[in-house]
C-alpha cells in the first residue's frame, strides 16, 4: 500500500490535499482501496511518498519564491544536504516544488534577490544535485502535482494524469474568490466552503462573522481581506465587478457592463431571465447576455460547499446548475480531523530524529 506523509506545518496545502485525496479514492481508475494521507512531523523535506511497510520512494520540499530567496540569503539552501543524505540511505527520488507565478522578469527582485539568481539555484539543483525541480502556481496547484506524483509512484493507475481535467465547482469558486486582490487559494477555499457570494453581498455574513474567520493554522484573516469583505457586504461596486469577473466566461469588461446600472444584489434577487435579457453593447452591435451566462452567474454566486448555509441564503438546486459545468464536488474529506493541530502530539515524527527507523527502510 502506498501513502503520502505531509509535514504538519504545511498548513496552506493540507486542506487541498485532503480534498484531492478524497477525489482520488473515488476515481474508478485507482485500484488501491485507501489512498492514505498521513500528517506528521518531518525533519527532512515537506512530503514523503512511501510504500508499506517502510519504504521511502520520494522526498519533496516545497518553497515559494520568497522562501527560496530567503534560503539563498541565510544559508538554509544548504539544507538540501539532508535530502541528499536521505537519498543516499534510501535510494529515494528528490523533488523541489518552487511555487509562484510562472516566468517573472529575471531582474525582478523577490525578497531582495533577483529572480535570475533563483533560476540559477534551481538549475544547480537539477544539474549538480540531480534533484527534480517542479514549478507550481499556488498551493492548490502544488497539491495537484503531489497527487500526480503519488499516482505515478503507486503504479496503480493506467495513466499518471487524472482522466478528467475539467475543473470542479469548488475549484471554480476558489478561483472566483481569488479574483479579489489579497485572497490566496487557501483563503479562497475557506470562503468557498463557508459562504456564497450572494450570502456576503446580501449582508447575511455580519462583520462579526467575518472577523471570526480563521486560516487553517487558526490565525485570523489578514485585516486587508476582512476590510474588503465588509466593503463588499456594503455594496462596493468596484469589488463587486472583480467578483463577478471571476465567474466562468465573464471577464472584467463584461462584468462592468452588467453592473453599469445596478448593484450585484439586484440581479441575485431577480429571476435568471431578467439577467439573461441584459443588453450588452459591443463595437458594432448590441447583444443579450444570454441564458448560459446568466445561469452561470446565478449558480456560482450562490454556490457554497458548506452544508451549514441556510436555505434562504443558499437556495440552489442541482436543476439550476448550468449544463455546461461539471458536477459539484463532495464535501471536504476528513482524512484527519485533528491532524493539523495535534500532529506533533498524536503522531510519531519521521526524519533525522528517528533516523534509526529511516536507515532500516528498504531501498526504493
From Swiss-Prot:
User: Which superkingdom heads the taxonomic lineage of this protein's source?
Assistant: Viruses
Stretches with biased composition (Polar residues): 319-328
Hydrolase as a keyword? Answer: yes
What EC number(s) has UniProt assigned to this enzyme? Answer: 3.1.4.-
Name one cellular component (GO) term: Holliday junction resolvase complex
Q: Any idea what job this protein has?
A: Plays a role in the inhibition of type I interferon signaling pathway. Mechanistically, specifically interacts with 2',3'-cGAMP and cleaves it via its phosphodiesterase activity. In turn, prevents 2',3'-cGAMP interaction with host ER-resident STING1 leading to inhibition of downstream signaling pathway and type I interferon production.
Q: Which GO terms describe its biological process?
A: DNA catabolic process; double-strand break repair via break-induced replication; symbiont-mediated suppression of host innate immune response; symbiont-mediated suppression of host type I interferon-mediated signaling pathway
- Which GO terms fall under molecular function for this chain's record? 3'-flap endonuclease activity; crossover junction DNA endonuclease activity; DNA binding
* Annotated source species: African swine fever virus (strain Badajoz 1971 Vero-adapted)
Name of the molecule in the record: ERCC4 domain-containing protein EP364R
Q: Which InterPro entries match?
A: ERCC4_domain, Mus81, Restrct_endonuc-II-like
Q: Which Gene3D superfamilies match?
A: 3.40.50.10130
Region described as Disordered: 319-352
Please name every pair of cysteines joined by a disulfide bond in this record.
none
> What triggers production of this protein?
Expressed in the late phase of the viral replicative cycle.
Location of the ERCC4 domain: 3-102
Span of the secretion signal? none
Q: Does the keyword Cell division apply?
A: no
Q: Which portions of the chain have biased composition (kind: Low complexity)?
A: 338-348
Q: Which UniProt keywords apply?
A: Host-virus interaction, Hydrolase, Inhibition of host innate immune response by virus, Inhibition of host interferon signaling pathway by virus, Interferon antiviral system evasion, Late protein, Viral immunoevasion
Amino acid at each position: 500500500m502506498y501513502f503520502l506523509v505531509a509535514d504538519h506545518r504545511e498548513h496552506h496545502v493540507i486542506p487541498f490535499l485532503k480534498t484531492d485525496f478524497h477525489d482520488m479514492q473515488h476515481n474508478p481508475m485507482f485500484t488501491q482501496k485507501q489512498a492514505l494521507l498521513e500528517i506528521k512531523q518531518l525533519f527532512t523535506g515537506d512530503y514523503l511518498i512511501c510504500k508499506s511497510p517502510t519504504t521511502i520512494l520520494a522526498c519533496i520540499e516545497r518553497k515559494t519564491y520568497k522562501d527560496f530567496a530567503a534560503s539563498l540569503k541565510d544559508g538554509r539552501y544548504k539544507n538540501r544536504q539532508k535530502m541528499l543524505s536521505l537519498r543516499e540511505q534510501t535510494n529515494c527520488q528528490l523533488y523541489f516544488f518552487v511555487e509562484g507565478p510562472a516566468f517573472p522578469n529575471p531582474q525582478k527582485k523577490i525578497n531582495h534577490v533577483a529572480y535570475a539568481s533563483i533560476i540559477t539555484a534551481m538549475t544547480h539543483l537539477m544539474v549538480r544535485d540531480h534533484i527534480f525541480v517542479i514549478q507550481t502556481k499556488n498551493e492548490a496547484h502544488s497539491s495537484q502535482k503531489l497527487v500526480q506524483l503519488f499516482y505515478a509512484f503507486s503504479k496503480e493507475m493506467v495513466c499518471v494524469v487524472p482522466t478528467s481535467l475539467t475543473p470542479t465547482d469548488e475549484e471554480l469558486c476558489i478561483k472566483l474568490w481569488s479574483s479579489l486582490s489579497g485572497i490566496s487559494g487557501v483563503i479562497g477555499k475557506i470562503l468557498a466552503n463557508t459562504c456564497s457570494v450572494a450570502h456576503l453581498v446580501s449582508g447575511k455574513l455580519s462583520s462579526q462573522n467575518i472577523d471570526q474567520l480563521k486560516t487553517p493554522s487558526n490565525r485570523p484573516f489578514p485585516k486587508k481581506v476582512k476590510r474588503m469583505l465588509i466593503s463588499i457586504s456594503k455594496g462596493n461596486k468596484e469589488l463587486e465587478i472583480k467578483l463577478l469577473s471571476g465567474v466562468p466566461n465573464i471577464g472584467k469588461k463584461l462584468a462592468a457592463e452588467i453592473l453599469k446600472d445596478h448593484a450585484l444584489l439586484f440581479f441575485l434577487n431577480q429571476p435568471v431571465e431578467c439577467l439573461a435579457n441584459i443588453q450588452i453593447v459591443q463595437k458594432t452591435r448590441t447583444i443579450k447576455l444570454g441564458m448560459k451566462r446568466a445561469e452561470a452567474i446565478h449558480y456560482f454566486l450562490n454556490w457554497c460547499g458548506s452544508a451549514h448555509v441556510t436555505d434562504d441564503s443558499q437556495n440552489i438546486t442541482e436543476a439550476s446548475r448550468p449544463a455546461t459545468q461539471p458536477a459539484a464536488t463532495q464535501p471536504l474529506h476528513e482524512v484527519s480531523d485533528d491532524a493539523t493541530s495535534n500532529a506533533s502530539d498524536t503522531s510519531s515524527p519521521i526524519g533525522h530524529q528517528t533516523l534509526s527507523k529511516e536507515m532500516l527502510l528498504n531501498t526504493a
